[in-house]
Amino acid sequence: MESLRLLGDAPRVAHVLAALAAILLIALAGRSLARVLRQPVVIGEIVVGLLSGPVVIALFGRDTLDAALPGPVFDVVKLIAQAGLVLFLVGLAHTLGAADSGGPRRGGTLWVATGALVPPLLTGLLLAGLVLASDDTAARGDAPLPAFVLMVAVSMSITAVPVMARILADRGMTRSAAGQTALAAALVIDAVGWLLLTLAISLGAGSLDGVLHSVGALAFGAVCALAVRHGLRTRAARSLCARLPRTAAVLLGAVALAVALAMEHLGMTAVLGAALVGLAIPRGTDAPWERAVTAVSRAGGALAPAFFVVTGITVLTGSFTDTSWRLISAAVVLGCVGKGLGGYLGARRGGRPPRTARRVAVLMNTRGLTELIVLQAGLSSGILTGPIVLALIVMALTTTAMTGPLLTLLDRAERRPTTAAYAVATESRVR
């Protein structure tokens, strides 16, 4: 409510706009750096965002950061940035639903989700076991054992929907088989991951009420999606969309934001709300919503980079000392193996050809932003400690940064046989 009252204060509104402009400039700098390093631009946005807070604090002190982004101003900026991400994901989820409507494809998606969820959970259990066996009290902390083990396992199993969505869009893979399979599986993992996260926090607090609350939130989201689908199929809604496409786009965006924020208020993630609305939007010749969806997604895409920067600013402003390189190395290796191997085997079991399965495996290792949110939840709840959070942050950034180069490497490797075969055929014809 304080954030909404802020919008009526002209000087504060100017402060919000200035802060938002500065954050978008930070995102632009991150994108430029990523292009120089031949990384997906979203990696640059996240890394620069992560470094922004610690750099400002180190150079100018915490008071300077608080003055530049006081609580009420930062809350409004974060809300605007989150709205951009929600609108951007509505378009991607709608595209995903249009391509993944068949039974066999959906079954394959579930196999990918299983492969990219269960093995990483097991590697997370192994990492937690290594911490316990090492008797590293700084990394272990004093949280209840079940809560600690489950939280580490969940942290290793995350795939970041927002970051993957940006990578797919930047590389033109949104409509590819690998891209749609990976994004659909990531949405399933996201839903399961948030339930497991709630369970871990509940175990840490000594109560399971939060789990039941999360199940209820998912049911609420499903009901909202069904209501949206029914409403958009009515004659009045179709007529409005055909006659006033801009008005229809504004109303569609408002509905998506309402459902997403309601899901977050109920303890889930706004990403799920956006995905549910995008999947619920009717498709086909009798449902003229494509133009409105495109407008909504483009508007969100302009603000989505700010979300990565805003979230990154809040993550690395605490103390993360006493982290051993052995712990960091174990987290990185186990993170790569669990997601990569599990994602590949799941894709092959789901009927995907080796070429698609390799790309799915690479994409499922995209953690990035969602991992940071989960780690922040584990740290703020007292279940995870600074040292293990830092190790998992390094793991998340490393595996995510590998996504772009590995996809490029796969493209080049698969082009070589084709080029070689063409050269041989040409030489034979000349002879």
PLM regions: where:
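Flexible hinge motifs at transmembrane-helix junctions and intramembrane kinks/re-entrant loops
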Residues: A29-G44, A258-L272
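Interfacial loop-to-helix junctions that mark the boundaries of transmembrane helices
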Residues: L4-H15, L65-A81, W111, T137-A153, ...
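Entry/N-cap segments of selected transmembrane alpha helices
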Residues: L6-G8, R12-I26, G71-D75, L96-A133, ...
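C-terminal ends of transmembrane helices
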Residues: L24-Q39, L87-R105, P162-T174, L226-L240, ...
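Membrane-interface junctions of multi-pass transporters
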Residues: S52-G108, T234-T247, L251-A330
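Hydrophobic alpha-helical transmembrane segments in multi-pass integral membrane proteins
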Residues: I57-G61, L121-L130, A191-S202, V255-T269, ...
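Short helical (or helix-break) motifs at transmembrane helix termini and adjacent helical loops
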Residues: L87, T95, T123, F148-L196, ...
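The feature identifies polytopic integral membrane transport proteins across all domains of life
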Residues: V41-V47, G71-V76, P104-G115, S134-M156, ...
